[in-house]
Amino acid sequence: SSEKGKEAAIESKRYAEENNIKVALTFSDPFMVTTFKEGFLDIIGKGVDLLFCNEFEAMSFSGEDTVEKAAEKLKKYTKSMAITLGDKGALIYDHEASEFIRVEAPRVKAVDSNGAGDLFAGTFLYGINNGLSFKESGELACRAASQLVTQFGARLENEQPKLLLKEYLS
């Protein structure tokens, strides 16, 4: 949210684009969207390849009152997107297939949501970079985030990611 941070993000995005590297961006948290929207617009420029946000960030940034309307409006800023919906899963837009995909989250008893969005994004990126479709990546990401919210702390235990992946792929 600082001027230097914004400049670094803009320069990183420029470098990535010049070198045919895809750019993913996350809105981070609702406070950032409300206080740093102009900065995000500067960073986004002509658009990013993949945007991560939650439903509240999507609606706040777009000015829309439903996540579906917000997602349509966000297509102006990104090729593809993944909008997390808490215990309702995620709404994903796959630019190449030109389709929205709803992914359900496993039903769990949540005790701490700290880090769930970050884990969702990291797992989703892992999936699409390892041959999974957007739908499969979203399913895996929802499973990982759902597992995380059942415990205190922002990280899964050491073996949990491997077990989740093995379970998903079997």
Summary of predicted features, one role per range:
Residues 1-102, 132, 161, 169:
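Ribokinase/PfkB-type carbohydrate-kinase core domain
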Residues 83, 87, 104-169:
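Conserved post-catalytic alpha-helical subdomain immediately downstream of the catalytic base
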